[in-house]
């Protein structure tokens, strides 16, 4: 939701400002990486509000660097690896840091709760990435572009930005612990839905042959 409906306009203006000033996409990605580390450290210390500022800044810059690369035609293999590598690796570290920071913020969990919540989030994160890889390899397309409902689901599924919305909302009501529990529950629910989605797609391919994106039929 944030990437599609909130960031496009400010990212457009940021790109238009940066492009003629010699700012490269890799420079933007580097700043985003710094924001990622700062968010992790602040979450770990229980400074959730400050951490969220840097986390949301990172998500914004993650949008800007791609637009800047396309606008200036300066994309590179290294830049692509750098950008996507950060995107792939950092979310689990944020969730772990948030969980560990709850104690410093006065919301300590017992060990059982900690591991159930973190296990659900990290397990769901890894399995969802595997589902995505299976879809690309066996179906020949990314699952979220198969049907309109899949594209819509992509906007709210348990990925970084929707999860940040849950964490931000929980902080606004003064219960950052509830936010991470909400992320765990939403991750498990989305994992089940993604599993059903993948099974439907595999069955459709066996029945109909090669699948195509609904976008190509428009």
Where are these regions (language model features)?
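A short mid-domain helix/strand-loop element embedded in enzyme catalytic domains
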Residues: 4-12, 17-20, 27-29, 35-36
């Amino acid at each position: 939701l944030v990437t599609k409906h909130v960031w496009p306009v400010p990212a457009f203006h940021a790109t238009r400002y940066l492009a003629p000033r010699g700012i490269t996409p890799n420079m933007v990605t580097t700043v985003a990486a710094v924001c990622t580390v700062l968010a992790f450290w602040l979450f770990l210390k229980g400074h959730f509000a400050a951490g969220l500022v840097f986390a949301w800044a990172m998500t914004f810059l993650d949008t800007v660097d791609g637009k800047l690369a396309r606008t200036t035609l300066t994309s590179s293999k290294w830049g692509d690896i750098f950008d996507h590598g950060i995107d792939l690796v950092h979310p689990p570290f944020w969730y772990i840091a948030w969980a560990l920071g709850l104690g410093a913020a006065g919301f300590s969990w017992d060990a059982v709760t900690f591991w159930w919540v973190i296990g659900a989030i990290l397990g769901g994160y890894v399995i969802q990435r595997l589902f995505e890889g299976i879809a690309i390899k066996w179906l020949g397309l990314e699952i979220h572009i198969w049907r309109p409902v899949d594209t819509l689901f992509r906007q709210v599924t348990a990925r970084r930005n929707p999860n940040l919305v849950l964490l931000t909302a929980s902080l606004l009501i003064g219960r950052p612990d509830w936010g991470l529990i909400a992320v765990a529950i939403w991750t498990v629910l989305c994992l089940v839905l993604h599993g059903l989605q993948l099974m439907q797609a595999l069955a459709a391919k066996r029945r109909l042959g090669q699948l195509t994106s609904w976008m190509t039929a428009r």
